[in-house]
Amino acid sequence: ICIVALFSSCDWVNDDLSDCPTGTWLKISYTYNILNVDAASTQVGDITILAFDKNDKYVDRLDVDSITLHQGYCMVRLPFPEETYHLLIWGGISGYQYQLPNLKAGQTERKSLNISLACDNKNQFNRKLNALFHSSLENITISEEYQVITAGLVKNTNYFSCILQDENNLPLRQEDFAFTLESTNGVIDYTNTPVGTTPTCYLPYRQELSLTSEQIPIIHARLNTLRIMKGDDTTLSIKHTPSGKTILHLPLTQYLLLSKNYPNNIGDISDQEYLDREDSYTLMFFIQSSDTGIPRIPTMKVNDWIIRLNDSELGS
């Protein structure tokens, strides 16, 4: 009865007037997050499913827009001919932020299928990223017999709320500070591994002067980046514009892991799993004046964890 109720609203996908579902269906799931709940219905938009044959050659694709996906309760019937396939699933690539290579049936190999961030000619990106998701399934046999296969997604986008505050609560000038996040993660391969060789420079997609609830003046910059890997070269820099000096050059990934915190219901997880599950961070930096006129940042907070910075991270 539950199956009939579910699929009675999905005839627009099945084109089958029978109440009994048939065929191979893909259930889009996103439980690989810090809350350990399925958030596909609220976080995943469009889905692109790429099918490859047993020789890893491209066969066909299915693009499912957000409305269609959610009307179908994140269930998609796979329309490919009866055969065994390797499936590569990307979520969030329907716009112009992400680029796939030209796909040719029978020619394009799965290992050559990298997705790239559409940066400007300086390899910079200053917009809010569309949430990007990845999944892959091996040896999936399509048939007319009813079956449901789950595709568990990994989220590849990370968002940072960077707050700059004077330690004496003095006002700051927004134009005096420039934030930059750099990482060689602007190209991701079919295994969801960043393979870029040129650093992508992520600039704030929003930066403003603001007041905290205690009426303390701050500079609030919002940045984002693609997938972060343990041991990678992702850095966050803050430049003091009047002097031209970089006052912070932070190996970001290791500091995110210093503040690793997650609910007990997830169990013990690796550093990489934490980086993949967590997608939102608040970074607070406390400015300290100096006799040279160039401020310093000796202390920061990562998601409420206070960290004292080493001189090597304080720029030059």
Model-assigned labels for residue ranges:
Residues V59-K155:
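Short, low-hydrophobicity acidic/polar segments
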Residues C119-I216:
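A sequence/structural signal for flexible, mid-protein segments enriched
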